[in-house]
From Swiss-Prot:
The keyword Manganese applies. Disruption phenotype: While wild-type P.aeruginosa grows readily on either quinate or shikimate as a sole carbon source, the knockout strain does not efficiently utilize these substrates. Growth of the knockout is enhanced by the addition of protocatechuate, bypassing the function of QuiC1. Requires a divalent metal cation for DSD activity, with a preference for Co(2+) but can also use Ni(2+), Mn(2+) and Mg(2+). A divalent metal cation binds at residues 134, 165, 191, 239. Catalyzes the conversion of 3-dehydroshikimate to protocatechuate (3,4-dihydroxybenzoate), a common intermediate of quinate and shikimate degradation pathways. Is required for growth on either quinate or shikimate as a sole carbon source. This is 3-dehydroshikimate dehydratase. Consists of a fusion of two distinct domains: an N-terminal sugar phosphate isomerase-like domain associated with DSD activity and a C-terminal hydroxyphenyl-pyruvate dioxygenase-like domain. This C-terminal domain does not show any 4-hydroxyphenylpyruvate dioxygenase (HPPD) or protocatechuate dioxygenase (PCD) activity, but appears to be important for optimal DSD activity of QuiC1 in vivo. Mg(2+) binds at residues 443, 521, 599. Coiled coil: none annotated. It is an enzyme of class 4 (lyase). It holds the Pfam family Glyoxalase. It comes from Pseudomonas aeruginosa (strain ATCC 15692 / DSM 22644 / CIP 104116 / JCM 14847 / LMG 12228 / 1C / PRS 101 / PAO1).
């Protein structure tokens, strides 16, 4: 099956779009009429450019408001079509998309509509061209694929077929299952788009909020599976109208587009193998299976000598012990429970380059995987960029891929026997690593540019088969923050992704500090929040002070006794409870160098969230702390 994308899905000029589409690895392209109208070359020039780039022009679109027009306009519309046919022949494509009429005065008699399409198809047949008819979700008389198919069937022309678009069906809660019963040869083209699930006018939804497969909330595998079951083996194409995409970097967005199609094919293959195993799936993308990801092995910070010492002191106050020094590099290992933190101040290293670009920051995350080789091959299949660093004497090579911000994701196999990566690379000691009782990394929250959220979600979904939670919009004292978390299938790796379009929010300040994406905060799990925080206070950890009014509100919301509320307030512990009775206790440090901070948390009774209800008070408290405002001592 050929993979395609509509030029309207990308930013830039038509040549820039085509070059990006080819570089990403697409087979073909849909030429959107406005892109052609705004290009200063001829259709033949576009044809030559596509040929030079190895792209096939699979479709020209759209041809609007044709069938069911008032009878006095039919002849003029047919002449209009002839001019578009001229253009198509210059472009070298044989298929045009005709979308259902949206005019207020469009007629609705099925026999008349079918006859109009018949006349159009007969004219196209003279030139060896094909007509693909698509039902727009906001079409005046035709807005479902079933209605469109009825007209195509009635018109009964060999060169007239159906064009299917996932958005137009799923936005109306349509049922695509019946597509499996259509003759596959009468489906001429399939367009795919995802979208967040919104309650709004369908036209506005389509024009502004479509996104690539895997970035929204539609069941696209459930849509594509019956298409494949019908016998269709034609192009799969992306048609995405999105305000953010119109400003996104053209080449990076094209790469995202191809990755999203591959991801959709994989998920459709899995769907078919579960539901209808007799359907052939050989033409659908089949990468190596995702390797089980069951935790974070270590987090690596890029620092220099001075900031490395300062961060090391911070972490030691949080209960981390210096557990080792690298055998040949200026790299330290700090440990507490199953948490391993690496401070890398080695000159002329990857970390040094990252530090020069971003300052003190998280430059690498090591994921625990069952099969590192398989995980790396899957990442390659999805367009991930492998990384190989310079190895010192007797140093173990760890496979890695670059994340979207240029940081590294190491792929570590956790062995129960033999020498660990730390034994190979570090001179370790017998330091007590029990610390405050912190046990593991609970989650790592990232601050991203506003246009980057969908790309990061797709990256983790495709390369690592992570799931994604729904978006949550949270108030900051200076604007709004949007958060969406991705997580490994077993839930042991959680990555809340945060964006803000407002200039003065905490997320925006992080982006300014890092000169790009960066870690927002790191959360550590513990078994006893009050014992851990008591030790942290005693060690001099700068904990974020929470306004006392917050605890008055807790008293109104929950049936807590005064003694327990006083304990929460004394230790600055925030509290949340979910609908199932799960509980979260968490406390935050003040930021390190006004960049990232740490969270200590305890989950009880299956609580799986991140304390969204407490984000506003935490952000307000941080704003107060920046201004030097301290609460009255208890």
């Amino acid at each position: 099956m050929q993979r395609s994308i509509a030029t309207v899905s990308l930013s830039g000029t038509l040549p820039e779009k085509l070059e990006a589409i080819a570089a990403a690895g697409f087979d073909g392209v849909e030429i959107f009429e406005n892109d052609l109208l705004h290009y200063d070359g001829s259709p033949r020039d576009v044809r030559r450019l596509c040929a030079d780039l190895g792209l096939e022009i699979l479709l020209f679109q759209p041809f609007r408001d044709f069938e069911g027009c008032r009878r006095e306009r039919l002849g003029r519309n047919l002449e209009r079509a002839e001019r578009k046919f001229d253009l198509m022949q210059e472009l070298g494509t044989d298929l045009v998309l005709v979308c259902s009429n949206v005019a207020a005065d469009a007629l609705g008699e099925p026999a008349l509509l079918a006859d109009d399409l018949r006349q159009l198809a007969e004219r196209a047949a003279v030139r060896g061209l094909r007509i693909g008819y698509e039902a727009l979700a906001w079409g005046r008389q035709v807005n479902t694929w079933e209605q469109a198919w009825d007209l195509v069937r009635r018109a009964d022309q060999a060169n007239l077929g159906l064009i299917l678009d996932s958005f137009h069906t799923l936005s109306l809660d349509g049922d695509p299952r019946g597509i499996a019963d259509l003759p596959g040869e009468k489906i001429f083209f399939v367009q795919m788009a995802d979208a967040p699930l919104l309650a709004m006018d369908v036209l506005e939804w389509s024009r502004h909020f479509r996104c690539f497969p895997g970035q929204g909330g539609f069941d696209l595998a459930g849509f594509l599976a019956p298409v494949v079951a019908s016998g269709y083996r034609g192009p799969l194409s992306l048609e995405v109208f999105n305000d953010g995409f119109r400003a996104a970097p053209t080449r990076a967005n094209a790469v995202d587009g191809l990755r999203s199609l591959l991801y959709l094919e994989e998920k459709t293959r899995e769907h078919l193998q579960r539901q209808t195993p007799h359907v052939a799936v050989d033409e659908l993308f089949a990468p190596p299976p995702a390797s089980l990801c069951d935790g974070i092995e270590f987090l690596e910070f890029a620092v220099d000598e001075t900031l490395g010492a300062r961060l090391g002191q911070w972490l030691q106050r949080l209960g981390f012990a210096r557990a080792g020094e690298h055998r040949s590099k200026n790299v330290s290992l700090l440990r507490q429970g199953d948490i391993n933190l690496v401070l890398n101040a080695e000159p002329y290293s990857f970390a040094h380059g990252f530090f020069e670009a971003h300052g003190p920051s998280l430059c690498a995350t090591a994921l625990c995987v069952r099969d590192a080789g398989q995980a790396l091959e899957r990442a390659r299949a999805y367009g991930g960029q492998p990384y190989r660093g310079l190895l010192g004497p007797n140093e173990r090579e760890i496979p890695a891929v670059r994340a979207l911000d240029g940081s590294l994701l190491y792929l570590v196999e956790r062995h129960t026997e033999g020498r660990s990566i730390y034994d190979s690379d570090f001179v370790t000691n017998d330091a007590d690593t029990s610390g405050l009782g912190l046990r593991r990394v609970d989650h790592v929250a990232l601050a991203l540019p506003a246009e980057g959220l969908d790309s990061w979600v797709l990256f983790y979904k495709s390369l690592f088969d992570f799931g994604a939670d729904d978006e949550v919009v949270l108030p900051d004292p200076y604007g709004l923050v949007t958060s969406r978390a991705v997580r490994s299938p077993c839930g042991s790796v959680r990555l809340p992704l945060n964006i803000s379009e407002d200039r003065n929010t905490a997320i925006a300040r992080s982006l300014s500090s890092y000169r790009g994406s960066g870690v927002h905060h790191i959360a550590f799990d513990c078994a006893d929040i009050f014992a851990a925080v008591a030790q942290a206070k005693e060690a001099g950890v700068a904990l974020l002070e929470i306004p006392l009014n917050y605890y008055d509100d807790l008293a109104a919301r929950f049936d807590f006794d005064d003694e327990f509320l006083s304990e929460l307030a004394y230790y600055n512990v925030l509290y949340d409870r979910d609908a199932q009775g799960g509980e979260l206790f968490h406390v935050f440090t003040e930021p390190f160098e006004e960049r990232f901070f740490f969270e200590i948390l305890q989950r009880r009774h299956g609580y799986a969230g991140y304390g969204a209800a407490n984000v506003p008070v935490r952000l307000a408290a941080m704003a107060q702390a920046r201004r030097g405002v301290r609460r009255v001592k208890l």
